[in-house]
């Protein structure tokens, strides 16, 4: 709502900039990460960056991820969500967000998500759009030579920050990432997100897609 009010009142007189959690490129070229860089994390210590994520508060200010991220989630749900959309059952919405974290890197199945959360498919669709509008998640469409089929086929869901996804999944340490069922999906999320950041930081549209053959 605030975004809409600003763009309507200052149309033609503003420039919008998307600020996302740090990319690997930023970690390498800045002094924000005094303890470690992306080169230090990958490939041997990538579980650590999967778990901590790259929000500035965690990376630049050294606030422990397991302290800051749960507070960020609570603030987002209790304050920001109320301002953006009139959601009456915040507990149910919280469950839905956690469910999305368990599906990062997977194809979106609105019917299944709605059934598991006890909501309608239309509500699930609206909540996905809300998470997307507030830069919690983004969607990646499947690649197909026929453009119309790209619009029809279901996209994949990715979190902008793997640390946020880990916090929602209840992962308490980098060591737990190593044996967690979502480890592969979190790694895929980290790569997909960094590709998207590469485009956004250069003022380009991130027209990325995923490939899936007949064998899945």
Task: Enumerate the language-model features and the residues they cover.
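Short catalytic/ligand-binding loop motif for oxyanion handling, primarily in non-cytosolic enzymes
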Residues: 2-3, 168
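Interdomain motor-coupling "hinge/lid" segment immediately C-terminal to the ATP-binding subdomain
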Residues: 3-107
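Accessory nucleic acid-recognition modules appended to NTPase machines
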Residues: 59-216
